[in-house]
Amino acid sequence: MKSIFFSLSLLLLLEKKAAGIELYAGGTKGHFLVKTSPLMFIGKNQFLYGHKEEQEEAPEESIFVQTKHHEYGQDADADMGGALSSQELTSLKEDIVCEEEDELAQQKSQLPSQSQIKSQTQVKSYAAQLKSQPGQLKTIGQVKSQTMLKSHGAPLKSFKARLNLREDIPQQVKGRGYGLAEDLAQVRQQPAKVHRLKGKHRQSRKTAAFYPQFRRRSRPYPRYFVQFQEQLQGSVHHTKSFYPGPGMCYCPRGGVILYQDAFTD
């Protein structure tokens, strides 16, 4: 806008020297008996160029500058003034175009360059890759942990087997303890058994002395067995077979067991 006002002021000075100036405010006024040059209108938001007849419908607030040339009877002066006005208008147009080009250049400078756009797209792609990398790292860690677990699986199995053996050993010891307790109970019961065997031995001697006729009449088989047991330390049982003569009874030391079928009529 500053350049426009500057060009207008320059134009007015030049036209003042050439032909004179008339300034009109508001609407259009009167008719002139002089030859008129093109008009320039300055509105609120517009800049117009044309003849007076073409611009009669402009708003009343507009201000236009009319340049005219007085007829002094010399066409050369009029032609010179028209040439000057056309040159000034072209210079004014060039100034406007230069200002527009400057504004466009500023806007272009404000816009991001292609390299910046490419870098931004690369940054976005790198950001997406970085976001996807933690998931990939997790999967790689899982694979490594699985391989490590598989490699340590066999030692763990062997160690588990050893632990199972260690757990079984106390149970075996307990079982052996139960067996030893049973053996100890049997050993403790041995004196009672010995006492019973001694009582049976005394009864058998009494019966043998009480029934002499049974001894005389009895005929033993050619071969018969008398099983006897002797109580020794360690609960060891000895069995002995023999062939006694007629009327004889073998009674070993420590006890005797006579079977009824050994003595028959």
Curated annotation (Swiss-Prot):
Cellular compartments per GO CC: extracellular region
Record carries keyword Lipid biosynthesis: no
Domain of life of the source: Eukaryota
Sequence repeat residue intervals: 116-119, 122-125, 129-132, 136-139, 142-145
One of the protein's GO biological processes: mating plug formation
Coiled-coil residue spans: none
Induction of synthesis: Up-regulated in response to androgens.
Post-translational modification: Glycosylated. Covalently cross-linked by transglutaminase, which is important for the formation of the gelatinous copulatory plug. Five repeats of Q-X-K-(S/T) in the central region of the protein serve as the transglutaminase substrate site(s).
Keywords: Copulatory plug, Glycoprotein, Repeat, Secreted, Signal
Signal peptide range in chain numbering: 1-20
Transmembrane annotation, as ranges: none
Main location: secreted
Subcellular location(s) per record: Secreted
Region (5 X 4 AA tandem repeats of Q-X-K-[ST]): 116-145
Tissue spec. comment: Highly expressed in the seminal vesicle where it is detected in luminal epithelium of the mucosa folds, and also in luminal fluid (at protein level). Not detected in other tissues tested.
Function: Component of the copulatory plug.
Protein name per its UniProtKB record: Seminal vesicle secretory protein 3A
Phylogenetic lineage: Eukaryota, Metazoa, Chordata, Craniata, Vertebrata
